[in-house]
Amino acid sequence: MSTRYDCRDSQSRIAGVDAAVTAARAGELIVLPTDTVYGIGADAFIPAAVTTMLAAKGRGRNMPPPVLVGTARAAAALVDDLGAFGQELIDEFWPGALTLVFRASPTLLWDLGETRGTVALRMPLHPVALDVLKQTGPLAVSSANRTGQPAPTTADEAQQQLGEAVSVYLDGGPCADSVPSTILDLTGTSPTLLRAGAISVDRLRTVASVIADDEHLVPSPDPADFKPAAPHPLEGGGARADAPTDEGPSGS
């Protein structure tokens, strides 16, 4: 049975965050607000939980979720190399609406799906999300919608779509900004813009002066899922990830 907490009330927020942390650690699904849309989350290091999350959304392993972190230090532990601009971009834009795609550390014991060795990371600018993430550690988070449906900007919309598949709903009120996160791929020789979003290219170029636009770049209404394409750098071949589909790459 699902439980919902109104995080606009301080006592309910404390209870809700505690319940969400307990649920995530037990391999259950949670819904939490972010600075873009509501996300459905699972412990990134419990493969069965990630599989359950994808099933709740009605999608397969070919569209792996991104990972949200509560601190920049947590992100550094998940990647093989931050690259030439990774740390500078993190310092300037996190927490915030910038999703960065890195080569994942080969030592990680997780299974997010068909990532081809990459991971899309973001640190959201939302106090409730950060309260949860600082206790759970990295969460696999996708927009809290069924595939093909609009990404929810309220807890009501998320609950209408996901129902009892989720153990804990954290209601933080309407999301402040429904514009999806900008997605930047740092796995190649130079940063590549995969999706235009809340942070403009001009702002990004104040930190990383050389940014290429992906040839298939398209806007996406759903800020929540990262879909890599073949060939991937770790398999030889070009250093690019696929552009967003209508379901969108991620960052919630």
Would you name each region that the model predicts?
Residues 1-252:
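Active-site-adjacent structural elements in enzyme catalytic cores
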